[in-house]
Amino acid sequence: MTLPEIDSLSITLLMDNYTDRLLPSSLIAIRPPMMKNEQFLPPPPPVAEHGFSALIRVASNDSMAYQNKGESLNENIILFDCGTSENGVVSNAETLGINFNSINSVILSHGHFDHFTGLPSILKRIDKPHQINLPS
C-alpha cells in the first residue's frame, strides 16, 4: 500500500474523557484561551465525559488542482468517532467554532456506545448530502 505525501496534519480533540482549562498552550497543543484583554471569556468550558472524538485535518499539495483551478492545497476533514452523549461533541465543536459542514468523512473506530452515540446529532448539523456505509 502506498500512502500519499501530505503537507500538514492537525488533530483537534473534541472528546477524550478529560478537560483542564488551566493548561496553557504549547508548541504541540493549542488550547482555547480562558481570558481576553484581562477578562474571562464567556463560553462554557468544554464538556468532559467518557468517550472519544477527534477532528482530523489532512492537507496536501495537489499539483493537478493547482493547474486546473489555481489552487494548491487539498484539505480533507475527518471526524473520527462521535462521543458518548447526544450533544457532548456538538457542544465542544461549537465552543471551538467548528462547522460540521466542513467534514468530508466520519469514521467510527468500533461499535461501542462511547464512540458512536453522538452521531445522529452530528449528522443533523451537516447540511449537505452524505452517504453512510456500514460493514456487512
Spans of features found by a protein language model:
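Active-site metal-binding loops of divalent metal-dependent hydrolases
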Residues: 15-17, 82-84, 111
